[in-house]
Amino acid sequence: MASGGGSLGLIVFLLLLQPKPCEAWAAASVLSTSGFPSGFSEAPRDNPPPPTRVRMSKATTRSPFMNFSLVCGQPFMKIMGGVDAEEGKWPWQVSVRVRHMHVCGGSLINSQWVLTAAHCIYSRIQYNVKVGDRSVYRQNTSLVIPIKTIFVHPKFSTTIVVKNDIALLKLQHPVNFTTNIYPVCIPSESFPVKAGTKCWVTGWGKLVPGAPDVPTEILQEVDQNVILYEECNEMLKKATSSSVDLVKRGMVCGYKERGKDACQGDSGGPMSCEFENKWVQVGVVSWGISCGRKGYPGVYTDVAFYSKWLIAVVNQADCLHPVVFLVLLLCSLTS
């Protein structure tokens, strides 16, 4: 009927007049459409440094965490020392996979989003993630979920040095939180992690450099101390006799004694630090020179530095679909 069509047209017109929360963010992210170096053996760095325990300044009254999830950073298991991670210690840790093959780590930041490194992503490849199990092979408590959409930072580059090495993966469907599946907290831009903070890096990467490109079966954990990018840059320039700045803003480093580091296969995984009884992801495993070499810190993407980009991508992706769904629903009701 003509009157029904007119009403629908008016409703759609009014919807289009409404300000869209995502519009301001539309240029903040890009869908991954071009190839990037990735994979278990090809990651530019797959050799990042371990984390440290977060110490934060309390001068600000703003929340130190971004609102990606109503709950985050409080696993049911307590974190303790060791090499193999106990079941449920790091419930935000995920394995980013191609078919059944582990290629990189990642972290669950809410029920439908995973944070990883941009260098882990190739275009035109179907990825999935495995969540909920410390074993990279077994599926006792785990789920394998296809990736719906991939967002790589638009300024990601591997020219001279790796820059803007961060990406977001939207899952095909949300997961339910359990003792083995739980998101990590994401720091706000004002989150001031201090040098020397003790954090932990986790992953299924190589235990020793030069080992076969096969992931370790059981999730590994290693503690590291945070080094801010200025000091880290000087350390790596000295170690490599380079005059080029290798570590810049947007990066953070981790270092402990020789032999304690991330390695190939750990890329994209989290550097997690405890703050006020919550675990916050300070870094994303990005790159390094060899693994666990004395005087060579591992380099991570600084998550707090990119927090606005992260929230922009999630807002844009999550607000687009409800409007489309509403218009389609109205069409079906009036047809």
UniProtKB/Swiss-Prot annotation:
One of its GO terms (molecular function) is serine-type endopeptidase activity. Residues 1-24 form the signal peptide. GO terms for cellular component: cytoplasm; plasma membrane; side of membrane. The keyword Protease applies. Residues 79-315 form the Peptidase S1 domain. The active site is at H119 (charge relay system), D165 (charge relay system), S267 (charge relay system). Keywords: Cell membrane, Cytoplasm, Differentiation, Disulfide bond, Glycoprotein, GPI-anchor, Hydrolase, Lipoprotein, Membrane, Protease, Serine protease, Signal, Spermatogenesis. This is Serine protease 42. It comes from Mus musculus (Mouse).
